[in-house]
Amino acid sequence: MFDLLNIVLVEPRFPENIGSVARASANFGSAPISLVKPEMWEIEKASPLATKQGLRLLEQIRVFDSVEKAIQDCVFCIGTSARVGGVRRETVSPKECAKEIMRYLEQGERAALLFGPEDRGLENHHLEHSHKLVTIPA
């Protein structure tokens, strides 16, 4: 079922962080990973952090030139953001985010979870494609 969830990393800066995402994804059900305009994508640098289970996900990564293309086959998208208010969409808790996404996956529909660059997060033009936002307490 988690193969219907698309983890989208927008403009990631460090391959090592992509490897960490692959490891986490493998530990929680192996959702595929898409990259949008990565600053640097080198599987050799990502692999040590992905571990054996995440390596398969790294080998299957798809790279896109826009968020729109990365999520084109998804019917629901949640963006991550540390900022709330302003022109932002409805914000849900991580627990509510999981429930919302599971509703789509259980119906056999694709959903996406957007994460922004490590140093600044998603910008408004990235979030335009999100139906809702989730703020993850850090």
What are these regions (language model features)?
Residues M1-A138:
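Post-transcriptional modification and biogenesis factors for structured RNAs
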